[in-house]
């Protein structure tokens, strides 16, 4: 059974709610850019299998633009993390790193952040698998991923 909320708890929850909503918006944008990077990586693998170097160069450029947008999202996240209370910062850092803790303390915004961070990590892992396979196929023993 939940204890009745004190006025201070309600005010903190509202303030955290606004912060968490903004962080969720950034994570949603990051997820969208990571999904596009994944799509472009898959497209690039297909272009490489057809030996279509012109298309590969164009796709690499588009992927680079999306990577820059992900960096911008990460920068915004870093700015938010540096301005939140230590307890919230620690929780957010763990969630973003994939070390998911309980989100019930942070309500529906917390659950959304956990879901977005998990989905982003899944897309990133899928993209890395495709990228690793392409890189090893092209570079062989000189692959960036050798011994990783």
Predicted segments, located by residue:
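Short terminal interaction segments
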Residues: 2-9, 92-148
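Extended, charge-rich alpha-helical scaffolding segments
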Residues: 4-98
